[in-house]
Amino acid sequence: MCSNLMNLGQDIKTLEENGADMLHIDVMDAPFVPNLTFGPDFIKAMQAVTTMPVDVHLMVDDPELIMSKFPVRKGDIVSPHIEVKKDYRALAAKVHEAGGLFGLAVNPETDVEAIKEYLDVLDTVTLMLVHPGAAGA
């Protein structure tokens, strides 16, 4: 969201050559947050230029739909928001089956206790310090 998209392929290669071991991408769909960013095709394009795992932060109303349109690779992280209230066990199973890691993101105003019932399927948790959707926040 804060990078020059015209140079992103080269930037990814430069990061990889200099020791980066993971990339992060924010996927926003406009209904869940006030911005619209990258989608599944962009994730696939990133995956095509690197073997580094991609940390996909899904700030979307329908994480199942987005997840069905890009491959989760070994080491990739997929983190939808707890506020969407989906079947996170089924989503986690799909991600784990592909060799990826599953997480949940939590908005600042949401009680962190909301993720308690999913702790047994979580590999990571993202605690948002600002409401999602703000660039560089």
Feature map (PLM): residue ranges:
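Beta-hairpin (beta-strand-turn-beta-strand) motif
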Residues: 59-61, 83-85, 107-109, 130
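Short glycine-/acidic-enriched loop or helix-start segments at secondary-structure transitions
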Residues: 89-90, 136
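Histidine/lysine/aspartate-rich catalytic loop segments that bind and position anionic ligands
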Residues: 105-137
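Conserved N-terminal beta1-alpha1 strand-loop-helix module at the mouth
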Residues: 1-77, 85-87, 93-102, 115-122
